[in-house]
Amino acid sequence: MSKFFNSPTVGIDVSADFSFVAILAPNGDVFKKPFRIKHDVSGFNHLLKEIKKVEEEFNMKTAIFMESTGVYHLSLFHFLNKNFDNTFVINPLVTKCNKNVDIRKVKNDKKDALSIAQIGKFQNIKLSQSVSMDIF
């Protein structure tokens, strides 16, 4: 069982220009339907406000999970990591294995964001909390 089992969790499916975000309540129910943010100051600030609402609602820290996506997740990861203690990157092989569990192979960004939030909340997996900005 994950150490974030009793925490609200955020799952983020990152792509080049935007991300889909899903938020789970501490009991595992969907707290906020998956929504889209752009990778710009306005989008990042909107996400910041949504996560702070969750923390105020439940009076506890939120765990934030996103899949490693080459370079696309780096700006969002560093923005969130600066604002929240529990920001983590999940190996894409872990999320791929979890997608293979479903009988129906449905692929969409909203479902992927929800799946990432559930993986972080319910599974005891290896997480990365630091990402190097060094390229060479």
Q: What do the PLM-derived regions correspond to, one by one?
A:
Residues 1-136:
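Phosphate- and other anionic-substrate recognition elements at nucleic-acid/protein interfaces
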